[in-house]
Amino acid sequence: MKIAIAGASGRMGQMLIDTVLRTPGVTLAAALDRAGSDAVGQDAGARLGKATGVIVTDDLRTGLSQADVLIDFTRPEATLAHLEIARELGVGVVIGTTGFTAEQKASFKDYGATIGVVWAPNMSVGVNATFKLIEVAAKILAQGYDVEIVEAHHKHKIDAPSGTALKMGEIVAEAQGTTLAERAVYAREGETGPRMNGTIGFATVRGGDIVGDHTVLFVGEGERIEITHRSNSRQSYAEGAVRAACFLAGKKGLFDMNDVLGL
């Protein structure tokens, strides 16, 4: 399996490159970065202290032509542009980017008609196991429990709430026969009045180098249940993304991490 990495100079890009280099059965075929990046022209492993023989390039088409699958943790506009070229070249895409609009996410199905696409707001195996626990809890605690979701990330994250937090909200809503759009409350300030029954509240924390913390609270009278996942490094995201890339071998269609993990 030949893998290309988008955003090669970023924190996640570097973790992905390192993970590909350490994973049997896969090779680093291309390392891609934006035009003007200091990394362009350097060995993809230079910042890791490893010589890979793969030079970082801003020529997306040439880079993708050497790969079977692209792993993309960049920004929505960049990812959509990458998808267009990947479709032309028949290259599968693993999308870890978050912050897409509902319309942009809906377009992934069109790409899946031609190439294999895995999109998930979080590639971590542990997070996806947490999703299952939340689904079970939401069904059991559908009556008499208020739901609040609290997430925390590093100060550089540009979207809020996180894609993972939104996915958690969707899971709760769907497990209880509703939609997140009907129930979500994204901000509270000033005199808000009593909490509205049936809402799903979100709280966002941004600071320092927090990799990613997510907690779903089911709060009843006299008790509360908290389901928490904490990421100590981006390694789990990278390993899940490489696993997803391997899953796409020979496949067309739109998939998520449930498909990759067989959940």
From Swiss-Prot:
Annotated metabolic or biological route of this protein: Amino-acid biosynthesis; L-lysine biosynthesis via DAP pathway; (S)-tetrahydrodipicolinate from L-aspartate: step 4/4
Keywords for this protein: Amino-acid biosynthesis, Cytoplasm, Diaminopimelate biosynthesis, Lysine biosynthesis, NAD, NADP, Oxidoreductase
InterPro entries with a match to the protein in the record: DapB_C (IPR022663), DapB_N (IPR000846), DapB_N_CS (IPR022664), DHDPR_bac (IPR023940), NAD(P)-bd_dom_sf (IPR036291)
Encoding gene per record: dapB
Active site residues according to the UniProt entry: H153, K157
Binding-site positions, NAD(+): G7, A8, S9, G10, R11, M12, D33, G96, T97, T98, A120, P121, N122, M123
UniProt GO cellular component terms: cytosol
Protein name: 4-hydroxy-tetrahydrodipicolinate reductase
Residue sites binding (S)-2,3,4,5-tetrahydrodipicolinate per the record: H154, G163, T164
Record-stated family: Belongs to the DapB family.
One annotated GO molecular function: NAD binding
